Amino acid sequence: MIYGIGTDLVRTDRMEKSLASPAFLRRVFGEEERAFLLSLAPRKQPESAGANFAAKEAFLKACGTGIGGFALWEIQVLRKESGAPYYALTGQAADLLEENRLTAHLSLSHDGGLAQAFTVLERTGD
């Protein structure tokens, strides 16, 4: 059963400017996320960071909490070896999924200076 759906769109040029701020990186991205983003070629960082940021906002929308629901760094977006994105949650974000028996599904895309994320939260075990 679908618990929530969220989507978000980010202009990657805005993210390019934000990536220059270490405080922004720490406030928004978890440790593993930062390591992944900084391992990319500089020209790839804004689109991947934009997609990750959009994924965080899409997750919050799917939860129904809005931007203040959880610390953004609790909602990490990582990549499988295949390149497929997934959520790695900690803190209150992880608690919400566990307490409500939810699985998070995520799709990311970026092109033409835009990054988009789509999230579905599915209740399992019903």
What are these regions (language model features)?
Residues 1-126:
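Core catalytic alpha/beta fold that binds nucleotide/phospho-ligands
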